[in-house]
Structure formats: structure tokens, C-alpha cells
Amino acid sequence: YHATTRPVPVEREATHRAISLAEIADVPLTIVHVSNGEATEEIMRARQRGLKVFAETCPQYITLTAEDLDRDGFDGAKYVCSPPPRTSQEWPKIWDGIEHGVFDIFSSDHCPFRFNDSAGKDAPGARQSFRNIPNGIPGVETRLPILFSEGVVKKRISLERFAEITSTNHARLYGLYPRKGSIVVGADADIA
């Protein structure tokens, strides 16, 4: 029921509401964990009106679906995150946003839980109600390989775009550029 209780229209409305409040307060806004095309459209409309709205998405929204939440046994609990993964029909919309600059940054939403731990996904009470399953999935170690293999290798995005949304734009958005996010004389040489 996790995906059913968090449908696309709710995310779209929350995106619209956050943008409206940022507009009233006259402040920039970063919308994180965008999982669908309707929320993406809200972001594009706000930008067309001249608002400073930035956007982020994560690996689970280009690789997982709501069906993963229904895997046999209790394995679906491993994929509980919010917003939940959507249908695979949303993937092209997210990829289009990645390719064409709607998404400024690509992050991990890293929030892992040990499956069998007392506070983990299969903790006491979790099987009685999906509401008791901790929200979050690991991602820091898979963010770059997933975007590279699914994006660059499959020619959905360029290598330059990969660098922008995984490094350069993060540094710009958080005021660290050009010391971070660039390979130039005088910048930090923290490349792996």
C-alpha cells in the first residue's frame, strides 16, 4: 500500500504548494526526490514564470517501480522510500528532465536500514502494517554507477551532463564553485 497512499497527484500538489510558498516568501527553492512527470511539469512552469526553483532526482526513480514494493515475501520492504518508485512509464519523463536540465542535481537519498535489525525494515510490527516499515534505501555507493551505466553508456546523457548533475551543479547550488565542482588550477583536487 505504500505507493497507493502516496500517489503522483499528491507529489504534484506538494510540489506546487512548495513553489507557491517560495514565491510568496521570495526565496529560492530546491525540490528534492522528484519521481514523476507531473511534478517535473510544475517545476518547469515555475521556471517559465522566472522563479528560482531547482530540482533533484535519485537513482530509484529511473530504476525501480512500484511493483518492486510488491515483491514476494517481505522483500518489497527493501524498496520503501518516499516518494515511492512509480511506474516505468515515468522513467522517460525523468530521463527527459535529466537530459534537458530540469534536474539540476542527481543525488542518492541515502537512508539505509539493515533488513533484520531491531530498527530495520523487518523490525517488530513492520509486517503488520506498511506504515511501520522505515522509509529509506541505500544509494551513496550506487548513485554514480547507475547514472553512468543507464545514462552515459546508454547515450541518454552526455559525459558533460553527467559531470554537471553529479558535481558541478551541486557545487554551484551550495556556493562551493569553483573551489569544488571543477577541474581547474586552484580548485580542490579531490577526484577519485
Task: Show which residues each predicted segment covers.
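Histidine/acidic residue-rich metal-binding segments in metalloenzymes
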Residues: 1-106, 111-114
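His/Asp/Glu-enriched, well-ordered alpha-helical/loop segment
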Residues: 3-26, 78-79, 105-106, 112-192
